[in-house]
């Protein structure tokens, strides 16, 4: 059995790490590099960095901090933010990132997924999906430009259908960002994760809702996700990654030690 991954998420805006609730009202958490170092030292398996306004601003992620992060940590990390071309992705990988993640650009140009997978290998290509449960329709809908409150909008895609589409096009991994749960710390949306897991045959990462250690255990044991991503519980030192791994091991969850 492959070990389950614990992945701190660092949302980056104007060169600093920020955190919001349900993708809104972001507060500044701190500088990128010291946080990355701290998580690597605590035992994180991987880090994910989202430049949350890059796509909505029409620019590519700022690569200067990518190089600085690569110099100080020895665990894999993934970078997302406005990557629209193979050239954009190549530069980020050259600066030291192990993976690139695309979200809004993939919705605008689904062929980009295939182009990147063919050029760099599927193991480098992550597709992030921002999924929102619409109580009026009773459906999970994919959203775009979620880093900008004024531009964020629903797309034509239902979540399950988009998951299947991105896999066909070459996504090597999917991060499911459950918008309703984001930052509220009352647990991952297990029902949604199980729905997606049924059709997802690539590694699936849960994102949005972690507040207690048991929430990680529930995601791993009840939905069989490959990794769990969290932000505020790590940023605010509510949960220590080393202690979380000890707890998960006690719950018979295979983790890297």
UniProtKB/Swiss-Prot annotation:
GO annotations of cellular component type: cytoplasm
GO molecular function ontology, one term from the record: imidazoleglycerol-phosphate synthase activity
One GO term (biological process): L-histidine biosynthetic process
CDD domains per UniProt: HisF
Active site residues of this protein: 11, 130
Functional summary from the UniProt entry: IGPS catalyzes the conversion of PRFAR and glutamine to IGP, AICAR and glutamate. The HisF subunit catalyzes the cyclization activity that produces IGP and AICAR from PRFAR using the ammonia provided by the HisH subunit.
Official protein name in the record: Imidazole glycerol phosphate synthase subunit HisF
Organism, as annotated: Aliivibrio fischeri (strain ATCC 700601 / ES114)
């Amino acid at each position: 059995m492959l070990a389950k991954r614990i992945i701190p998420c660092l949302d980056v805006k104007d060169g600093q790490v920020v955190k919001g609730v349900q993708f809104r009202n972001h507060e500044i958490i701190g500088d990128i590099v010291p946080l990355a170092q701290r998580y690597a030292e605590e035992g994180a398996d991987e880090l994910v960095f989202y430049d949350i306004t890059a796509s909505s601003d029409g620019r590519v992620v700022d690569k200067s901090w990518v190089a600085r992060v690569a110099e100080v940590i020895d665990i894999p990390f993934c970078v997302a933010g406005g990557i629209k071309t193979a050239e954009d992705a190549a530069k980020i990988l050259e600066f030291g990132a192990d993976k690139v993640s695309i979200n809004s650009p993939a919705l605008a140009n689904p062929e980009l997924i295939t182009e990147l997978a063919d050029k760099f290998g599927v193991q480098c290509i992550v597709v992030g999906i921002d999924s929102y449960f619409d109580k009026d329709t009773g459906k999970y809908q994919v959203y775009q430009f979620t880093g900008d409150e004024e531009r964020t909008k629903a797309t034509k895609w239902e979540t399950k259908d988009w998951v299947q589409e991105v896999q066909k096009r070459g996504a090597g991994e999917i991060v499911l960002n459950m918008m309703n749960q984001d930052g509220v710390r009352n647990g991952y949306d297990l029902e949604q994760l199980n729905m997606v897991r049924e059709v997802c045959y690539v590694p699936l990462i849960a994102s949005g809702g972690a507040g207690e250690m048991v929430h990680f255990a529930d995601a791993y044991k009840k939905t069989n996700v490959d990794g769990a991503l969290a932000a505020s519980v790590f940023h605010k030192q509510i949960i220590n990654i080393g202690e979380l791994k000890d707890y998960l091991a006690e719950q018979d969850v295979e983790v890297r030690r």
